[in-house]
């Protein structure tokens, strides 16, 4: 039996695609082994979101060939799409697969075995591509499954290469999403996370008036699924109608990641983000109107070109005002091929580091405050796995708001939803469950 190893770099969409490619290989009779072991085939699903991601992708391709010089090394994904010539000239790489050919993995391996011909990468931006159907019915996790429902992005933020790597918006057919959710439910999964490159755009490429809300409502009707989470959302999707209709669904998790990037309108304009801080705040207000204490999380970029001290302080004050559950703080890094990379007034790395530290500290304080709200309250927790915290063993899981909880027990609670009382804080990041 031939052996194959896969390695994923990047986002949750990439992770889904890697699991789908593993499924294809298993169906074709391959034995899946850890990436560190010797294999006949190595598949690296690459990332290109930053220059560092490009470098890591190259490193993993070279590592694969070093593991077994006689192996077939497959480079797939975003780095392949943005750096085609570089990848085709890389002697470590045998097969290249862009972001619309992953379903062809097994066929391309068979063809390569016959004539050793490398493949070319299609232009993902020519507007001629449909959603690439990939399927999973199992994941590495045993309780939560990520489902890719959308690909591509039409936004073209000035710092981002992803529209060039992923192409225009393409949505997965409604019936195919539901069929996959039903398969996962039949295999015991209780929670699904709907994800995409630009999830809020789901359905804009359909002739019929079907959008993300209608998809969520349909998933909510699937028997066996008890929780639905959403990937990153654009602020403008949160209208009164959207928030009101979501709140009527019994399975929706009140955990919303609204991408912000900056709390300053001038910075947002340079980023080519298509909303104002006032519009963003309105989205948060609506979520808090229709959900009790929802978890609102976000991303923030510090040190974007031209960000003055005054603009940074405005962002910091805005973050405190919105009061997020969690914030992912990124120091701006140049990405070749984007408009921001050639903008004037690039910020010194030391200044970026100081600003980042300030926001990370702020985020830590806000997260701790958010978690404290639950002390003394009864919550439902989906337990996932055992973990050693301090020197004691606990079962850990998450509330609907994605707050991590630990319970001291000898029972096997894996994939069980249990009701109980939050008695206190075990650590700054984990609540204690009775």
State where each predicted segment sits.
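Proteins enriched for Cys/Gly/acidic motifs involved in redox and nucleic-acid/cofactor modification
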Residues: 1-202, 217, 241, 246, ...
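Short, solvent-exposed loop/turn segments at secondary-structure boundaries
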Residues: 53-55, 168-175, 203-209, 270-273, ...
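Terminal RNA-binding accessory module
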Residues: 342-434
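Short, electropositive alpha-helical surface patch
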Residues: 207-220, 240-254, 307-325, 349-354, ...
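Conserved strand-turn element in the central/C-terminal portion of the radical SAM core barrel
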Residues: 156, 160-167, 227-236, 262-272, ...
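Radical SAM/AdoMet-radical enzyme domain recognition
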Residues: 186, 213-214, 221-227, 239-298
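Hydrophobic, well-ordered secondary-structure elements that form the walls
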Residues: 258, 299, 319, 327, ...
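Generic beta-strand/beta-sheet core signal
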Residues: 7, 76, 195-197, 231-233, ...
């Amino acid at each position: 039996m031939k052996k194959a190893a896969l390695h994923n770099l990047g986002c949750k969409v990439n992770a889904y695609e890697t699991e789908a490619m593993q499924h294809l290989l298993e169906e074709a009779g391959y034995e899946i082994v850890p990436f560190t072991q010797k294999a006949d085939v190595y598949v690296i699903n690459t990332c290109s979101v930053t220059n560092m991601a490009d470098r890591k992708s190259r490193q993993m391709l070279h590592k694969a060939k070093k593991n077994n010089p006689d192996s077939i090394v497959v480079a797939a994904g975003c780095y392949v799409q943005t750096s085609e010539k570089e990848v085709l000239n890389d002697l470590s790489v045998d097969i290249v697969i862009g972001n619309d050919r992953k379903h062809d993995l097994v066929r391309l391996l068979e063809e390569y075995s016959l004539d050793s011909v490398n493949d070319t990468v299609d232009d993902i931006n020519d507007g001629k591509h449909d959603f690439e159907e990939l399927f999973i019915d199992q994941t590495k996790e045993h309780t939560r499954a990520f489902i890719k429902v959308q690909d591509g992005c039409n936004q073209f933020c000035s710092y981002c290469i992803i529209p060039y790597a992923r192409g225009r918006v393409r949505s997965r057919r409604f019936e195919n999403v539901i069929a996959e959710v039903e398969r996962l439910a039949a295999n015991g999964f209780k929670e699904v996370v709907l994800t995409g490159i630009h999830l809020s755009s789901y359905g804009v490429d359909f002739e019929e008036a079907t959008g993300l809300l209608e998809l969520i409502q349909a998933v909510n009707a699937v028997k066996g699924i008890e929780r639905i989470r959403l990937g990153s959302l654009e602020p403008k999707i949160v209208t009164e109608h959207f928030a009101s209709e979501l709140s009527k669904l019994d399975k929706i998790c009140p955990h919303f990641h609204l991408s912000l990037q900056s709390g300053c309108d001038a910075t947002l304009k340079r980023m080519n983000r298509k909303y104002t801080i006032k519009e963003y705040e309105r989205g948060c207000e609506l979520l808090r109107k229709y959900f009790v204490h929802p978890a609102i999380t976000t991303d923030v970029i510090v040190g974007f070109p031209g960000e003055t001290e005054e603009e940074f302080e405005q962002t910091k004050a805005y973050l405190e005002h919105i009061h997020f559950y969690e914030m992912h703080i990124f120091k701006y890094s140049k990405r070749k091929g984007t408009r921001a990379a050639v903008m004037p007034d690039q910020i010194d790395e030391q200044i970026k580091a100081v600003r980042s530290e300030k926001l990370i500290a702020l985020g830590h304080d806000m997260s701790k405050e958010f978690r404290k709200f639950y002390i003394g309250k009864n919550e439902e927790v989906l337990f996932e796995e055992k973990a050693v915290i301090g020197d004691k063993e606990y079962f850990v899981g998450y509330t609907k708001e994605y707050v991590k909880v630990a319970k001291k027990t000898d029972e096997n609670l894996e994939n069980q939803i249990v009701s109980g009382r939050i008695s206190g804080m075990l650590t700054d990041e984990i609540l204690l469950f009775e």
